[in-house]
Design a protein with these regions (language model features):
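Structural core segment of the AMP-binding/adenylate-forming
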Residues: 1-4, 106-183
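AMP-dependent adenylate-forming
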Residues: 9-18, 36-61, 166-168
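Conserved pre-ATP/AMP-binding loop-to-beta segment of ANL
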Residues: 45-48, 160, 179-211, 218, ...
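Conserved AMP-binding/adenylate-forming
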Residues: 57-61, 74-118
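Conserved AMP-binding A3 loop
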Residues: 60-64, 178, 207-233
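Conserved ATP-dependent adenylate/AMP-binding module captured primarily in the ANL superfamily
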Residues: 116-148, 232-249, 280-293
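Gly/Ser/Thr-rich phosphate-binding loop
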Residues: 175, 293-296, 305-400
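Conserved AMP-binding/adenylation subdomain of ANL enzymes
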Residues: 230-247, 254-341, 379
Length: 400
């Protein structure tokens, strides 16, 4: 964890003002995952945390909504007698995917986020390995769940997020998330079952198992604690100056720790809003619609964007002119004149017109891409990490 000993503590906001390493911005401190959810709701309230699509309809999800959902999910798990158990969550990125993750961890359970694209054999293997008792999944996973059902006798409940139950098999273990939510709401409000609020978590206890192939190609379960996740989140906030008025578009798989820690923990701690990309084919359309100020990506996305930029430039026969403009803008920048966003307006417009920086990790990125994007006026903060470190190890701050 970063050294906060020389950092001014802002008592009123419960935050740190990070002044070492040349960074000067507020980092809101929280003690555990639920403490983070509670403090975010207090700071940002009805501000939109997520824009997302469900059943073809655009919806919003506020910071207050997140706290309410975590409270009700935690209460529901306790009411059904499966709090503190091994719980799987799989499927598409969804606000309630995040809420389930946080609620399970906040009730002394172990969350197992699984890749939605793994084979049926891998899925059942991971579930059996962990003695999983509860499965939360989005509607896109219904066919896989149905196909694997005979191998999942240990599972007590299958809870479908964003589904009406019309595709459920004839099995009493299935319920819609809406029904489960009502169970949790009743338990929380009428029976005073409030485990997330009252639980004092062991920060060193395992709260998540992340299956990753790593460098060996053999799947393994990485065990993470709340201390791991909280530390990585606060360090991410300290390095990257994300602000309350920032807008992100989430495009990476949510089961990866990189995406979850950075996009689903660090961004909300800073009060940013995130639009969940509903489909790869809609990415550019969503950039235009939501106008992100920053993105969290892997090199494959950055490489693809880079190739498309130059393909469009070459299509217009403007490569030499653009290179000359880049050289000129770089020279002007050295004397304090920044006209990059004006000169390369067309490039910025392709990303919605407000993109300032990209956080990139997961694999090495070619240095020339970092340099060229900087010439265009888009800073790339390149990071390095591994799942075992949940995942942050190092990152160059904005402007470095």
């Amino acid at each position: 964890m970063l050294d906060y000993t020389n950092v001014k503590h802002v008592e009123k906001e419960g935050a740190f003002l990070k002044k070492d390493t040349g960074l000067e911005h507020v980092v809101h401190k929280f003690d555990n995952l639920y403490d983070g959810i509670k403090k975010e709701a207090e700071r940002y309230g009805d501000k939109v945390r997520y824009y997302y699509h469900e059943n073809g309809e655009e919806k919003t999800f506020t910071y207050n909504d997140m706290k309410t959902h975590v409270d009700y999910i935690a209460a529901g798990l306790t009411r059904l007698g499966v709090d503190g158990k091994f719980t799987c969550v799989t499927g598409d990125t969804h606000p309630d995917y995040v809420a389930v993750y946080e609620a399970v961890a906040s009730t002394n359970g172990v969350i197992i986020p699984l890749d939605k694209d793994i084979s049926n054999e891998q899925f059942t293997g991971f579930m059996q390995f962990c003695n999983t008792e509860v499965v939360f999944y989005t509607a896109s996973q219904q066919k896989k769940i149905n196909a694997c059902l005979s191998e999942l006798s240990l599972v007590k409940y299958f809870i479908a997020i964003g589904a009406d139950g019309s595709d459920f098999p004839n099995d009493p273990r299935f319920m819609s998330f809406a029904h489960f939510f009502e169970v949790g709401k009743l338990a929380y409000e009428e029976e005073d079952i409030r485990p997330a609020e009252r639980n004092v978590p062991d920060m060193d206890k395992m709260c998540a198992i992340i299956f990753t192939s790593g460098t060996t190609g053999t799947s393994k379960g990485v065990m993470l604690s709340q201390k791991n996740l909280v530390t990585a989140t606060l360090d991410s906030n300290a390095i990257i100056d994300c602000k309350e008025d920032d807008m992100f578009v989430s495009v990476l798989p949510i089961h990866h720790t990189y995406e979850f820690t950075c996009s689903q923990l660090a961004l909300p701690n800073a009060g940013a809003s995130t639009a969940i990309n509903d489909s790869i084919k809609n990415t550019l359309r969503n950039f235009a619609k939501y106008k992100p100020t920053a993105l969290i990506l892997v090199p494959l996305y950055v490489e693809t964007m880079y190739k498309k930029i130059w393909a469009e430039i070459d299509k217009k026969g403007k490569r030499k002119m653009v290179r000359a403009a880049m050289k000129m803008s770089d020279a002007l920048l050295k004397v304090g004149v920044d006209i990059r966003r004006k000169i390369f307006k067309e490039i910025h417009d392709a990303f919605g017109g407000r993109l300032k920086y990209i956080v990139c990790g997961g694999a090495p990125l070619r240095p020339e891409l970092v340099k060229d994007f900087d010439s265009f006026g888009i800073n790339i903060c390149e990071g390095y990490g591994i799942t075992e470190c949940s995942p942050l190890i190092s990152c160059n701050p904005k402007g470095w």
